């Protein structure tokens, strides 16, 4: 009887130990599953933000200062952008613009030059829009604010929110056409407006065969 009792107690101890081990294992599994679920949710949110966030290029305008315009090159460009629908705020101080004419590639960074241009009648007039003066001859861009829904945009870290619209102002005199600074006629330009996060705005156009006006629509 004593041997049977000892065996029974031993079996009970083993059973209890197995239950405890199973409980600990279950706790570890549940904890790991919870952690993985949170990681998956965070990754899903991040992926959604990456897909939804980004920059949309609305229009691109070019400018030549020559008289007549057909004698000149495109020396300046204004790239109008807005956020994609559902996009988070985009810090324009971290944006880069990449432009290429197939022979040269230029990367522009934010110059820190920022101006409210909602009431400006001539965006390419250097008297009214000072960002052109501060970026002249450099691989940097200035920002002319066309529409600021929340009136919260400021120069140090200008943040583009849904409904906002700005013009990124760049000099294109780093390019050359027939020994003249600037972009010539019938030239294909490709590039991107690249935010820190999210989809880049696409630039892809061919300049007119003849420059009939000082200001021209490029894209």
From Swiss-Prot:
Main location: other
BP term (GO), one: archaeal or bacterial-type flagellum-dependent cell motility
GO molecular function per UniProt: structural molecule activity
Any one of the GO CC terms: archaeal-type flagellum
Record keywords: Archaeal flagellum
Top-level taxon of origin: Archaea
Pfam families: Arch_flagellin
Localization per record: Archaeal flagellum
Prodomain residues: 1-5
Stated role: Flagellin is the subunit protein which polymerizes to form the filaments of archaeal flagella.
Similarity comment: family membership: Belongs to the archaeal flagellin family.
PANTHER family: FLAGELLIN B1 (PTHR35903:SF1)
Name the record gives this protein: Flagellin B4
Organism: Thermococcus kodakarensis (strain ATCC BAA-918 / JCM 12380 / KOD1)
Encoding gene (name): flaB4
């Amino acid at each position: 009887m004593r041997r049977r009792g000892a065996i029974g107690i031993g079996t009970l101890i083993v059973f209890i130990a197995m239950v405890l081990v199973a409980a600990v294992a279950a706790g570890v599994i549940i904890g790991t599953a919870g952690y993985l679920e949170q990681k998956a949710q965070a990754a899903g949110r991040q992926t959604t933000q990456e897909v939804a966030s980004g920059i949309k290029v609305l229009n691109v305008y070019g400018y030549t200062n020559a008289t007549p315009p057909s004698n000149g090159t495109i020396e300046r460009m204004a790239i109008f952008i807005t956020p994609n629908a559902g996009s988070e705020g985009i810090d324009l101080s971290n944006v880069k613009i990449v432009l290429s004419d197939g022979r040269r590639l230029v990367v522009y960074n934010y110059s820190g030059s920022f101006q409210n241009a909602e009431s400006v009648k001539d965006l390419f007039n250097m008297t009214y829009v000072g960002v052109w003066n501060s970026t002249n001859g450099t691989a940097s861009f200035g920002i002319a604010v066309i529409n600021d829904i929340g009136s919260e945009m400021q120069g140090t870290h200008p943040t583009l929110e849904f409904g906002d619209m700005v013009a990124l102002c760049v000099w294109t005199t780093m390019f050359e056409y027939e020994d003249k600074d600037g972009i010539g006629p019938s030239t294909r330009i490709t590039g991107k407006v690249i935010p820190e996060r999210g989809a880049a705005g696409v630039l892809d156009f061919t300049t007119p065969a003849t420059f009939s006006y000082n200001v021209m629509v490029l894209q």
